């Protein structure tokens, strides 16, 4: 049986988060192995170091999120200050998957996965190199200071540009995601998240990981730059938005420099820039990988809708962002920029952002603005998260690198290396470069010959072979017909289902799906609905009716986004619509085959299928799908009238909405209420949904409409003040756009700063001199009880005389507090031993215990010296020395 370790690093904030209904238990059960709960401090330690992920590590109590944990310096221990009611229900999740337990065995009913057939070849192939030779160079400018980031952020980049290309050229900017920042060139196991890197460690060159795509684009006439964001990665764990605003500011600082260098300041540009053609700042494409995807999306929003307050960038916007490419992106805020076209890569074997939450860059744009901008999703069968960046790829990277698709207890039938469905690193990077180039051709060159590769038309780019890349889209020249809502009617084998709900009867199902990813603090999101189809005999029709008749005039085809379970055989449906005169018109049949999947994948993804629309349909009142198979299930995401080509995208004057962070001192007594402001720009009617907790810590979601002239919503947060010491407490607020609004800062909070002095700590020996087999003990006493755990960590120091070794103490105790085996015997001060001790809230004392064991070896007196330092609060500490006499 695999053992886990119980170590932790203290955080400084208690997060008070929405809780879902749970039955009360008379006595809270104990947490599972690997967990430790001391009052309001929760810690979990992985069996081995876990490189930082873009998705982050979250602690959950059943279905209630407690918050995002912070990693320790050794990348093994994760900590959160929160108060679980049921420690036995604690879970570690990242992008929806469990990290603290072995994954379940695949269900016996899940069919064997098969590689999808190659799609027909498209007329255009953007993966072919262009006519230009390329040049490569780098620049390093003075670092910048950003709010919330203590250390300056580097302004480093690699430039790949075409040689001898005439005139100004479109600019493509790449931003990498969250990765470890430093590594040792002599010890492959030594990595870290510091910035700047300490002595002996080297910065990871993540920004050099997109050279293959940059070289392809440069050969086709685009100037490209890939920027470094190590300074953001090392510090974004302390920010409320996981670094989205900081990444946006970094991008905009670089764009400002490029705008300067394209104009009067060209003579002072770095050599790598001067050797490139001037950039055409009216044609900019942003490419973001992982958290970099969320960062460039925020940069697009900040460029169209300037952010309030100090974001570290205040200059004019001298560029036009024509599109975003988002590679395996995070979107914690569910806040896409609806008026900037986008293409989102969804890697089928993503082991980091494994819930494929980037789907929200498509789905969450519906109904928010005019719907003219194309938003495309590309499902890449067999692609993982890391290999789009060569500096995160084993065998290519300068620093240590790994396959992010975790191996699990048994090989995955789809994603294990060597399977027919898994791409190699080179295949994945080639496919990625090809579809980035397709996006550049479409958004920057307005070359619509590549549009069928991105808009669900079911064709492929030969340069990306053998990759299977499927696409669907919203926006462009589409007219919404069925976009499920609470007003939608469904009958027959169909029902309206909630994408986000704690009610199994109302929910769309428990299967992992990119379309069902929920907003972080939401127990329900009423605006997010789908149509669930389930039939037990061929011909059981599903009928779906929008709230009002919809005109399909001018549309050439009806496009449906339809998902069937992973590995399902080809599932055929006869499609018809009913017009306002009651006439049913048969449109033809569509067929959808399940994507290759296992229980570990988010493969319930909607594929786009189309049927011709005859002339004269006019207004349609109902959509009917009649399955031809004997039984089955499907999920209809939406249906649109479709015509080929794009329509002009004129950004709407959307109101920008931002949740703010309000900081207050706690106070001394009574029930206190403070407001968290949610600010809004714009003068039209704007609708958003808020998420927060009420006075009983019950989750609240509220639909809010801001009328013309209204620019603020106050969210009341109530707490009880006292004179006992405790950590500062964060009460979060979330906001999601519903109509005529774009969200900048999706997360705000009331930060209640504790203003009480910490209790005084005294330490007294209980048994600091024992014989072998005895237990060394010290008692820690506080001058008064606190509201929160009083936490310290102790490290062993060499005592200067005979020192206790790993075999002089209890082996299980040593393993639980170090993660190391006791053999071979070695001094305690040479190990990773950490003794964490917490005085729980409401109590005033606790003992530190070091259990020793007897042995047959004749020894003199041995000692252990422990140095304790406060983690919460900081600034306290002490040293103790224990003596152990030989039993012989």
Predicted regions and their residues:
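Secretory targeting and sorting signals
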Residues: 1-24
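Short conserved active-site loop signatures built around small residues
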Residues: 25-174, 181
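Alpha/beta-hydrolase-fold serine-hydrolase catalytic core, especially in secreted/extracellular enzymes
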Residues: 25-37, 51-53, 60-65, 71, ...
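Short, surface-exposed "cap/lid" segments of acyl-processing enzymes
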Residues: 163-222
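Gly/Ser-rich "nucleophile elbow"/oxyanion-hole loop immediately N-terminal to the catalytic nucleophile
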Residues: 164-167, 238-288
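Active-site-adjacent alpha-helix of alpha/beta-hydrolase-fold enzymes
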Residues: 340-416, 425
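Short boundary segments that mark the start of a structured unit
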Residues: 649-888
